[in-house]
From Swiss-Prot:
<dbReference type="GO" id="GO:0051260">
    <property type="term" value="P:protein homooligomerization"/>
</dbReference>
<dbReference type="InterPro" id="IPR000210">
    <property type="entry name" value="BTB/POZ_dom"/>
</dbReference>
<dbReference type="Pfam" id="PF02214">
    <property type="entry name" value="BTB_2"/>
</dbReference>
<feature type="domain" description="BTB">
    <location>
        <begin position="76"/>
        <end position="143"/>
    </location>
</feature>
<dbReference type="InterPro" id="IPR003131">
    <property type="entry name" value="T1-type_BTB"/>
</dbReference>
<dbReference type="InterPro" id="IPR011333">
    <property type="entry name" value="SKP1/BTB/POZ_sf"/>
</dbReference>
<protein>
    <recommendedName>
        <fullName>Putative BTB/POZ domain-containing protein R541</fullName>
    </recommendedName>
</protein>
<comment type="similarity">
    <text>Belongs to the mimivirus BTB/WD family.</text>
</comment>
């Protein structure tokens, strides 16, 4: 684009004009430039300040503070986009005040410090009220007005004492990943918070309220894993250990039932007793399509179940991460220089529910039996956007026929390698392929090994 090209900026009910030479070094504006136009939903006075700053005018400290989120002048500040309105806020404040942003910034860390390309589809009016509540935390009327919004951003009123997480809340929090139970260590996302009731009993609630269920006698479950919490009314656990948990697996022609005592679950490290909170936590892995769990409980306490619903939403918190390693063979039937592989074929080998998860490929290896064959580069090609990335390959020190992707030069900041299938679905409606440019033609099998992890997420 020529430096003299006129750029039209529409902001609320105001209209501005400038030239491309003025804005070309401002990523905030150029990233929103479409057909010589920029449309914004921010305070027009901020754009006036910004354009004057870009034109070389000296602004006072107050004006600079107002446009800081557009020119990155403040340390440790990030830009977020809530409902189309941009905020430039201190990272530590956000992550400590609203736990939602801890996971949000971690998941989108490749965008740091400008996260505005990821729309947080919530009301910015309500978000303004949340920021106001931070300054007036004793305003009960305001709290009741924005209570639902605070719950979405994972804010708990009892967490804060002068904007700091209280020691009492820390003491009452249980991080399941810290418990001595083998399977639960994979559940990084689960955190149960204790809450005192009027009767003095402690009730455990999940921070993901929509995925929290009360357990009533029996329930059909169709999820791979289920967390069962047992809150004991008394301190005596001996009677409970002899209770029987019945797993009824339903098949077409017969029903198979397996009975196991809670004591056996303890021995197999499927369950753990949290003595300090008088709580039993069980991690049950269910691989059958339909299964009924009958819990024989004898009124010893309250039983709750928690299980993930595997629906993808990049703006919500992580559910869990599963790491796997897979080997897939591609057969080259003819002498060719370019090997072409559709990434969605990879995913179909992994699961039939790929649209419900994010798959991130941590490492991809290529093993070519022919010692004389090597790879020049790898390209990631989209049917809609063309060449997205180009990579060099690094041969293995132990196996000269084994190649690993070393680095990629990313053309689009929203596509990153490791390959993120969530991004693949957004950026390629038809296909997304990997091209391997070989130095010599091959007529052989190429083994492709890839290590990946799955991130299942909540609504």
């Amino acid at each position: 684009m020529e430096n003299t090209t006129v750029i039209n900026i529409y902001c609320a009910d105001k209209f501005f004009q400038t030239t491309y030479s003025t804005i070309k070094k401002c990523n905030f504006l150029t990233s929103k430039l479409i057909d010589n136009e920029i449309r914004l939903n921010i305070d027009p006075i901020h754009i006036e300040y910004l354009l004057n700053y870009l034109r070389g005018y000296l602004l006072d400290e107050l004006c600079m503070e107002k446009i800081g989120y557009m020119i990155d002048v403040l340390p440790n500040h990030i830009t977020i986009n809530v409902g189309g309105k941009y905020y430039y806020l201190d990272r530590d404040f956000l992550c400590e005040y609203l736990e939602y942003f801890k996971v949000f910034t971690e998941y989108n860390k490749h965008l740091d410090p400008d996260y505005s390309s990821v729309l947080i589809d919530r009301s910015y009016v309500m978000f303004d009220k949340i920021l106001e509540y931070n300054q007036k935390s004793t305003n009960i009327e305001l709290y009741n007005f924005i209570k639902q919004e605070l719950e979405f951003y994972l804010f708990k009123k009892e967490h804060l004492t002068n904007n700091q997480i209280s020691s009492e809340t820390k003491r009452q929090s249980i991080e399941l990943s810290e418990l001595p139970i083998s399977k639960i260590t994979n559940y990084e996302f689960i955190k149960y918070i204790t809450k005192k009731t009027k009767t003095g009993n402690i009730v455990y609630k999940s921070i993901h309220e929509n995925h929290y269920y009360h357990y009533c006698n029996s329930k059909i479950l169709t999820h791979e894993n289920t967390i069962i919490l047992i809150k004991l009314n008394g301190s005596n656990i001996e009677q409970l250990l002899h209770n029987i948990v019945s797993f009824k697996r339903d098949y077409c022609d017969h029903t198979k039932q397996e009975d196991i005592t809670i004591s056996k679950l303890f021995q197999k490290k499927i369950a753990v007793h949290d003595k300090s909170n008088n709580l039993i936590i069980m991690d049950i892995e269910l691989n059958d399509k339909d299964i009924t769990i009958d819990f024989n409980y004898f009124n010893d306490g309250s039983v709750y179940i928690f299980h993930p619903i595997n629906l993808i939403n990049s703006e919500k918190t992580f559910f869990k991460k599963i790491c796997k390693r897979v080997c897939q063979t591609i057969t080259c039937r003819h002498n060719i220089n370019m090997v072409k592989i559709n990434i969605t074929d990879f995913i179909e080998k992994i699961t039939c529910n790929r649209e419900k998860c994010v798959y991130i490929f941590d490492k991809i290896y290529f093993v070519i039996p022919n010692h004389n064959v090597s790879i020049n580069y790898v390209e990631l090609i989209s049917s809609d956007f063309g060449n997205l990335t180009t990579s060099e390959l690094l041969p293995s020190k132990t196996n000269p026929n084994k190649f690993m992707i070393k680095t990629l030069q990313t053309a689009n900041k929203n596509i990153r390698f490791n390959i993120c299938v969530d991004a693949i679905h957004r950026y390629s409606r038809n296909y997304l392929e990997i091209y391997y440019d070989l130095k010599q033609p091959v007529n052989t099998d190429i083994n492709i090994m890839y290590k990946y992890h799955i991130i299942k997420q909540s609504y």
